[in-house]
Amino acid sequence: RLFPPQAEALPHALSGKNMMLAIPTASGKSLVAHITMAHRLANELKGSRGVYIVPLKALASEKYEELKEISSCVGLKVGLAIGDRGSEMSSIEDSDILVCTSEKFDSMLRGRASLIEDIGIVVADEFHLLQDPSRGPTLEILLSRIRHKREDAQLLALSATVGNAKEIAEWLEAELICSDWRPVTLYSGTLTGLDLRYHSI
């Protein structure tokens, strides 16, 4: 059973629309992206490639394992590009879905610009890092380049903490799905002496 934000987001995503999904941690952003990417690449976008962009190598490895599990059900191959293995190139060449950091994908495009030509769908996870002074510029330039070269490519931006979701959605020409729903109640606590009091948020 889908969480409410997932149920709201999936029809938009599966229809091929660009989407900015701004919902709390653990409310199901990644599953929406995984289902959309696997479904569309196995159907409407057959023959195209999906790119799943994350900010950190550790997160790339995690998403790679998750996407492999879902994508294997529809016969799609997933590749990982984080620059740590000499054997990566063969899996990159054969992949239907490529999981990578923005820096690695930017480097790959500089070395082989033709990689951009078959992109059908892009997921940008932890999208609030667009505002990070060290990582943001690379991601922004990368997405601008993809949007310029592949105008029809679908873009899904995911974030739990982005502060200006409406403005970003407008920049991406994307549907904005914004919710504060959580699967569990969030509490804050105050400790005065030995007295601990919890308050729901």
Regions found by a protein language model. Name each.
Residues 191-201:
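Alpha-helical transmembrane helix bundles of large polytopic membrane transport and channel proteins
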Residues 2-192:
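Conserved P-loop/Walker A NTP-binding site and adjacent catalytic elements of P-loop NTPases
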